[in-house]
Design a protein with these regions (language model features):
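Generic beta-strand structural signal
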Residues: 81, 93, 104-108, 116, ...
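P-loop NTP-binding catalytic core
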Residues: 89-98, 102-103
């Protein structure tokens, strides 16, 4: 059986080549591209300016990735929406819509599961199942935009998975998401997270994109980082920070450091002092995240007073710092709470 072409993962030039290989005119590619990336149709039959013969050929030769919305949970606290989407193979992923005054932001998953093993994160509990394709990552945004009838203005790749562990597909996703012929989201409105895969961070830097890189730091010493994040067994903290500096040098984009505060683990005065020394002189922003509970782990959130104390210590040393607003916590839609499910679990 011949494998069908995942047309929604093709850029316009690749789509043109595919159409030419079918004996079609090149301009057809632009029409199909707009149907997929602007109108977000769910079938080839909806592409009404194509001939019936071409639509039938596309059904035979191509695959139009469409995610099925299985469940939407809405937070009673802040209106955050968590979407459960079914993939064609029966796996499921979660995505989150957050509404702000400045626009609508979507947090997307990059993998089914994750193999990084961060101790406070639900996404990694079952390990890595597979990478998501560029079209499956895009589809999370398209389905949510169609669901709410409003434009998505910001995207954060911080759902299930380690984006840099799915590097090629993430880079292609960025290309498609920011393309002027598609949704055309500004690179500056896109944030990609990583737990610190140094070679991939440098590779991304060399592309000189204008996206924000968010490093999951979570500790100010190598030993504590190893305790919380197994990836620290592969890369020293100094290597990771050097990669962050390299990213800034290449792109001019300020680095965001994500720091989950775990009660009694990484929230002491000494931790704050080490963190100050660690990022001193760097053009960065620190996002403090009160760790969110997951039932399989016994980590607890730092006391509110400790969080404020930690923040004040950083501010007094001239560091740009904020405490992340906890959105969607009551529906397990907050940072570290997204997980891989299979269709049989819903």
């Amino acid at each position: 059986m011949i494998e069908k072409v995942d047309v929604k993962s093709l850029n316009l030039k690749e789509l043109e080549e595919f159409l030419l290989s079918l004996g079609e005119k090149k301009f057809r590619a632009k029409q199909i591209y707009e149907w997929m990336h602007i109108h977000h149709v769910t079938s080839f039959d909806e592409m009404t300016n194509l001939s019936k013969n071409l639509r039938e050929t596309l059904k035979e030769k191509a695959d139009l990735t469409v995610l099925e919305e299985e469940l939407v949970q809405i937070s009673k606290i802040d209106g955050t929406r968590k979407y459960l989407f079914a993939l064609a193979d029966g796996n499921m992923i979660e995505s989150v819509l957050m509404k702000y005054k400045h626009g609508n932001s979507v947090c997307v998953s990059s993998q089914v599961g994750c193999r990084m093993g961060c101790r406070f994160c639900a996404s990694t509990l079952d390990g890595l199942v597979r990478n998501l394709t560029p079209s499956e990552i895009l589809e999370q945004i398209y389905r949510i935009q169609e669901s709410i009838g409003e434009r998505i203005s910001n995207v954060v790749v911080m759902g299930s998975g380690e984006p840099m562990d799915n590097y090629d597909n993430i880079v292609k996703f960025i290309e498609l998401l920011t393309d002027e012929h598609g949704l055309h989201i500004s690179q500056r409105n896109l944030t990609v997270s990583t737990c610190g895969l140094v070679p991939r961070m440098k590779q991304l830097a060399d592309l000189k994109l204008q996206i924000t890189l968010a490093l999951s730091l979570h500790a100010s010493s190598q030993e504590k980082r190893k305790e919380l994040m197994p990836v620290a067994n592969s890369y020293e903290l100094s290597e990771v920070l050097d990669a962050c500096r390299y990213y800034f040098d290449k792109t001019g984009r300020r680095i965001t450091f994500e720091y989950s505060l775990v009660g009694g683990v990484n929230d002491t005065d000494e931790d704050a002092e080490r963190l100050v020394k660690l990022v001193s002189g760097m053009n960065c922003h620190i996002n403090l995240i009160p760790v969110n509970p997951i039932k399989e782990r016994d980590y607890v959130q730092s006391d509110h007073e400790e969080i404020l104390k930690f923040k004040n210590k950083l501010e007094k040393n001239g560091i740009n710092v904020t405490i992340r607003r906890e959105m969607g916590r009551d529906i397990d839609g907050a940072c570290g709470q997204l997980r891989h499910r299979h269709i049989s679990e819903t």
